[in-house]
Curated annotation (Swiss-Prot):
This is Nitrogenase iron protein. It catalyses: N2 + 8 reduced [2Fe-2S]-[ferredoxin] + 16 ATP + 16 H2O = H2 + 8 oxidized [2Fe-2S]-[ferredoxin] + 2 NH4(+) + 16 ADP + 16 phosphate + 6 H(+). It comes from the Bacteria. GO terms for molecular function: 4 iron, 4 sulfur cluster binding; ATP binding; metal ion binding; nitrogenase activity. GO terms for biological process: nitrogen fixation. HAMAP family: NifH. Its EC number is 1.18.6.1. Its cofactor is [4Fe-4S] cluster. InterPro entries: NifH/chlL_CS, NifH/frxC, Nitrogenase_Fe_NifH, P-loop_NTPase. The keyword ATP-binding applies. Belongs to the NifH/BchL/ChlL family. It comes from Leptolyngbya boryana (Plectonema boryanum).
Amino acid sequence: MSDENIRQIAFYGKGGIGKSTTSQNTIAALAEMGERIMIVGCDPKADSTRLMLHSKAQTTILHLAAERGAVEDLELEEVLLTGYRDVKCVESGGPEPGVGCAGRGIITAINFLEENGAYEDLDFVSYDVLGDVVCGGFAMPIREGKAQEIYIVTSGEMMAMYAANNIARGILKYAHSGGVRLGGLICNSRKVDREIELIETLAQRLNTQMIHFVPRDNIVQHAELRRMTVNEYAPDSAQAQEYATLARKIKDNTNLTIPTPISMDELEDLLVEFGLLGGDEEYEKAIKQDLAKRGA
């Protein structure tokens, strides 16, 4: 396998942040620019390719391997499907809830794809990875040097920023051994007060950039109901142009850095600074008011 010229990128982000939606819309825009791309879904929900394939959920490598008895019994054509603009689509899958490690599917899938020539004739490979925790399995694309550029999907909400900081910590751990770098934060807007300024400040603290701010628009949900990307559903819309702009920024991005994660105290101080979290005095005042109400 010769993959030296392939741009291997990964989208990480906490569950529910819109990571898979953002990544698929961005990849669709890249494909429209003529790029040859494969998506490797690394989320147990197996929803990383459904907008590209116009389907509910793609059958995963791990599911088929369990049915057959071993991953060696699979054919590449069974798990690699072609979607919108000829984007190749694969879902690694995960075990039954409460049994085994979800990261195992990622390791199994990538090894299978490599051994069967799936990485040939590509410009980009995009890994869509669950990012609430960067455990051994979910860190596999980073740890093994597969994904070289990480884009973190976040918002101005505290838990999304907390997850982004944790992911940055995971990138730092493998930056020197695997060569992985942080490409930037993608702010998928939740309409939080001063959200652009907040994420730009977080990006500075993490030694990276806010590569793009994706505004909130109901057209995204309208497209998802039809299992389509916005680019396909409403190509002339303002939101489609936002994803095209993000895709162009990623394509041209050379600002790849080793992140500098911050402490929980620093993150909370940042939220206090932007008025999204009360300081100690406000906290104590709120507690006193609550106790007074209970005593009344």
